[in-house]
């Protein structure tokens, strides 16, 4: 069985501040115990530099604990007249290691199709970033028992456009749309069922990738349900939304992941 390091990725969405970055790192420096889990902060682009400064300032205090920086989105284009967009190279220059691709809010609010998501996935890898690909079904799709069908389609488009080894350097986040920001989380059993399907699906393309890829759960994860979710054999941590803005609760999730 592969030893997959758990990850807790905090997606601030359009929230946060430089002060929040400072507050988080102050607690990281005294509370994070080891490198058994990886912590990723994904602030709005304007605060990437604030997080980077805190990473540099607290490097010694973190004592080897794995705290990384990620972005919430990138352009599929390398450069050009794309007002308001940020390229993969720009994110790499800013110190990012990860970038969230295809979040349900981007797909729903900004019309990002699966083809666009696949292009952004490729752009991230081209510039040395690890994409965190979000997949998930809507409430009606789950009720119609189409969960696996929807997720398979979202995975297959990425493979078709980027090749069978596309997920060799990637992370997947399963975020059921009916749980994102609603306060209603999937049960541990529901999460495990879908994560196992994703792993099996990718194993059909590459057994190595299927066994080793990290699959996060995202959707109303809190300190009260994280332990049961993270204990599932195919759940490798969480993509965290609202709770990532509360330094105490987010640190609690990190501690739970480290002991999972």
UniProtKB/Swiss-Prot annotation:
It is found in: Cytoplasm. Gene3D superfamilies: Aldolase class I. It holds the Pfam family TIM. It is an enzyme of class 5 (isomerase). GO terms for biological process: gluconeogenesis; glyceraldehyde-3-phosphate biosynthetic process; glycerol catabolic process; glycolytic process. The active site is at 103 (electrophile), 175 (proton acceptor). Belongs to the triosephosphate isomerase family. This is Triosephosphate isomerase.
């Amino acid at each position: 069985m592969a030893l997959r390091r758990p990850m807790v990725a905090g997606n601030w969405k359009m929230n946060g501040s430089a002060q929040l970055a400072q507050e988080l790192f102050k607690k990281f420096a005294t509370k994070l115990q080891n490198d058994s889990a990886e912590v990723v902060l994904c602030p709005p682009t304007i605060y990437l530099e604030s997080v980077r400064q805190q990473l540099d300032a607290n490097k010694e205090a973190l004592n080897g604990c794995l705290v990384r920086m990620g972005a919430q989105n990138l352009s599929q284009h390398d450069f050009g007249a794309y007002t308001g967009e940020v390229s993969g190279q720009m994110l790499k220059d800013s110190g990012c290691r990860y970038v969230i691709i295809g979040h349900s809010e981007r797909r729903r609010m900004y019309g990002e199709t699966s083809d666009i998501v696949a292009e952004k996935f490729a752009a991230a890898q081209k510039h040395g970033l690890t994409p965190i690909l979000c997949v998930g079904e809507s409430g009606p799709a789950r009720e119609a028992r189409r969960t696996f069908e929807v997720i398979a389609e979202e995975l297959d488009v990425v493979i078709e456009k980027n090749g069978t080894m596309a997920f060799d350097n990637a992370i997947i986040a399963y975020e059921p749309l009916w749980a994102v920001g609603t306060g209603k989380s999937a049960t541990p059993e529901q999460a495990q069922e879908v994560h196992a399907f994703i792993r099996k699906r990718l194993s059909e393309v590459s057994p190595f990738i299927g066994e080793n890829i990290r699959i996060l759960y995202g959707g109303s994860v809190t300190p009260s349900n994280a332990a049961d979710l993270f204990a599932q054999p195919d759940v490798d941590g969480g993509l965290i939304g609202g709770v990532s803005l509360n330094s105490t609760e987010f640190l609690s999730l990190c501690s739970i992941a480290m002991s999972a």
